[in-house]
Amino acid sequence: MFPREKTWNISFAGCGFLGVYYVGVASCLREHAPFLVANATHIYGASAGALTATALVTGVCLGEAGAKFIEVSKEARKRFLGPLHPSFNLVKIIRSFLLKVLPADSHEHASGRLGISLTRVSDGENVIISHFNSKDELIQANVCSGFIPVYCGLIPPSLQGVRYVDGGISDNLPLYELKNTITVSPFSGESDICPQDSSTNIHELRVTNTSIQFNLRNLYRLSKALFPPEPLVLREMCKQGYRDGLRFLQRNGLLNRPNPLLALPPARPHGPEDKDQAVESAQAEDYSQLPGEDHILEHLPARLNEALLEACVEPTDLLTTLSNMLPVRLATAMMVPYTLPLESALSFTIRLLEWLPDVPEDIRWMKEQTGSICQYLVMRAKRKLGRHLPSRLPEQVELRRVQSLPSVPLSCAAYREALPGWMRNNLSLGDALAKWEECQRQLLLGLFCTNVAFPPEALRMRAPADPAPAPADPASPQHQLAGPAPLLSTPAPEARPVIGALGL
């Protein structure tokens, strides 16, 4: 419901090729409620909505704008891949059209009143640009607001040294939350001016502040936002926008009134019955002023009406007739694998030549972005490693301290020092080296240990055999004092293995 306040805003949602719907809405507002556009404090827009808002603020002919919408959609449909064909340059088409139709002082009319929704590439935040220093800045703001990544190109355009992309990514319907903002959208939902689909589904999807009801018609509209429909469908969308604009004006009592604040009668106390009768009479009066369905095209601008009628007429020249024949169409389809690379190469060459003036700035930006991405990846990897290594390293050190064997002269320190640093710091490799060191010790001990065991008889010590002494005289006094001589024998020591380890 439109609030009866002193100030109000108008906001147009982004919708791609469905922007022809806004041409019908804007034509209705200019014709039946010009004060609503002239006295609006701000007019906002995103993507295709920004083009419509710019046209309303600067006074561009809506008929020419609608004709351009249909012309661009027809050019896109001529190609095999539609708007994705390399020869179709949407950014170039928008810039050339705005250069042609915008007046030289358009930035003066737009500054402070026009708001264009943009998405900043560096942080993804939404930015609303409302001050423009020149006509070129106004055109560049519209180009940035309609630049869809990958769909329109890979390198985003810049405005005042900052890179921006489509404003619908971050905020597709600026200032929708304010009560004094008239929201316009080609998708049925909760916007003030939008199609009224007869659907029983109460569920809705809110995409970047845009209310979209779940139904088949909205799904069809979403599919045609980036891939334009047929001219007949565009004509019906323009008529639908005109009808929805009339419905909004009638519902809020703004139809054919110079100013809603001046046209309202003075307030006076009255009962509930009088209030109901007044509302019914106002509705009946407004409904009587609505044009019929068959005469809607008569109320559109003459240039737009002519463009819509021409779009529905099939050309009858000889070349078009031949190209529409089935054999010619089959031959054209079969030649696509051969003609498409040639067309792509030609289009790439033309775009490269047009890109040459901006090459230094774009290369510098790509270098900065590549460095930022690499730095982010390195910092993220460091955080992950720092989170896992401190928890595992103390346990690993403690296990090595407990399970280590006595050091030997032949250790693995030399081998570890010979390895790269990243291999020495790897825990799994350290475990493998420790196990290899243990196996090496066992092999060395088994190789150089010798069990030298001698029989006990070999270690028994015996006295050397002396020559037999001369028989002594038993009668001598020495023989009588000495007595019998005992046997000389030494007990054999226990046999012990002699361990000899070379170098151990």
UniProtKB/Swiss-Prot annotation:
Keywords: Cell membrane, Cytoplasm, Disease variant, Glycoprotein, Hydrolase, Isopeptide bond, Lipid degradation, Lipid droplet, Lipid metabolism, Membrane, Phosphoprotein, Signal-anchor, Transmembrane, Transmembrane helix, Ubl conjugation
Motif (DGA/G): 166-168
Pathway(s) served: Glycerolipid metabolism; triacylglycerol degradation
Regulation: The triglyceride lipase activity is inhibited by BEL ((E)-6-(bromomethylene)-3-(1-naphthalenyl)-2H-tetrahydropyran-2-one), a suicide substrate inhibitor. No differences in the acylglycerol transacylase was detected in the presence or absence of ATP.
Motif (GXGXXG): 14-19
Catalytic activity as recorded in UniProt: a triacylglycerol + H2O = a diacylglycerol + a fatty acid + H(+); a triacylglycerol + H2O = a 1,2-diacylglycerol + a fatty acid + H(+); a triacylglycerol + H2O = a 1,3-diacylglycerol + a fatty acid + H(+); a triacyl-sn-glycerol + H2O = a 1,3-diacyl-sn-glycerol + a fatty acid + H(+)
InterPro entries xref list: Acyl_Trfase/lysoPLipase, PLPL, PNPLA2, PNPLA_dom
SUPFAM superfamilies: FabD/lysophospholipase-like
Organism, as annotated: Homo sapiens
Sites of the Glycyl lysine isopeptide (Lys-Gly) (interchain with G-Cter in ubiquitin) crosslink: 92
GO molecular function terms attached to this record: acylglycerol O-acyltransferase activity; diolein transacylation activity; lipoprotein lipase activity; mono-olein transacylation activity; phospholipase A2 activity; retinyl-palmitate esterase activity; triacylglycerol lipase activity
Region (Disordered): 463-492
Span(s) of short sequence motif GXSXG: 45-49
Modifications made to the protein after synthesis: Phosphorylation at Ser-404 by PKA is increased during fasting and moderate intensity exercise, and moderately increases lipolytic activity. Phosphorylation at Ser-404 is increased upon beta-adrenergic stimulation.
All copies of domain PNPLA, residue ranges: 10-179
Matching CDD domains: Pat_PNPLA2
Transmembrane region(s): 9-29, 43-63, 138-158, 330-350
Tissues showing expression: Highest expression in adipose tissue. Also detected in heart, skeletal muscle, and portions of the gastrointestinal tract. Detected in normal retina and retinoblastoma cells. Detected in retinal pigment epithelium and, at lower intensity, in the inner segments of photoreceptors and in the ganglion cell layer of the neural retina (at protein level).
Enzyme class: hydrolase
Subunit structure: Interacts with ABHD5; this association stimulates PNPLA2 triglyceride hydrolase activity. Interacts with SERPINF1; this interaction stimulates the phospholipase A2 activity of PNPLA2. Despite a colocalization in lipid droplets, it probably does not interact with PLIN. Interacts with PLIN5; prevents interaction with ABHD5. Interacts with FAF2.
Name the record gives this protein: Patatin-like phospholipase domain-containing protein 2
High-level lineage: Eukaryota, Metazoa, Chordata, Craniata, Vertebrata
Membrane association type: Multi-pass membrane protein
Cytoplasmic side: 1-8, 64-137, 351-504
Signal peptide extent: none
